[in-house]
Amino acid sequence: MIMKKILYILAAAICLLTSCEKQLKFPEKLYGDWYCHSTSLTSTDVHVYVTFNADSFTLYQKIGDGAYRVYSGTYTLTPGADGLYILSGEYSDGTPWGAEYAVLSSSNDTMVLTAGDVTETYTRVTGGIPEDVKNSAAPVKSAGDAGKAADGAEGLRFL
């Protein structure tokens, strides 16, 4: 009788554990496709998509009325002070990101990055980055090719 109760309790516990939504931990939480829907970097209309893989990224950005441009490179995610993670990286042309970002908060669906007085908020893209964005993006070979924003910012790159 006691053994039967233990088996029922064990079976119920297994069902409960397998039915819960898995909460990803860093760095796995970062992996995937993201869209930047809010930035304090510029007043210009921007559209930024980024894919984070295990140690590399691909970034698609459109500033103002311009075309999408695609950048790629590598990144690192390291534990920082106060339990925050620090996100930094380098473009494929060897240029480091404009700043290191503190990951202020992150869930499976939202991520807030900050560097100094710049804050960017990303939401996870379900279904991947739109194909029209990928297909229309011009590859950028160097920082000099990064383009010019409508507000005059030269070589503006997100991240």
PLM features per residue range, with description:
Residues 47-57:
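Conserved beta-hairpin
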Residues 4-10:
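Sec-dependent signal peptide recognition
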Residues 32-35, 50, 111, 127-128:
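Low-complexity, Ser/Thr/Pro-rich intrinsically disordered segments found in N-terminal tails, propeptides
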Residues 21-35:
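N-terminal helix-cap/turn-to-beta initiation motif at the start of protein domains
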Residues 40-45, 58-117:
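Contiguous, well-ordered beta-strand patches that form the walls/edges
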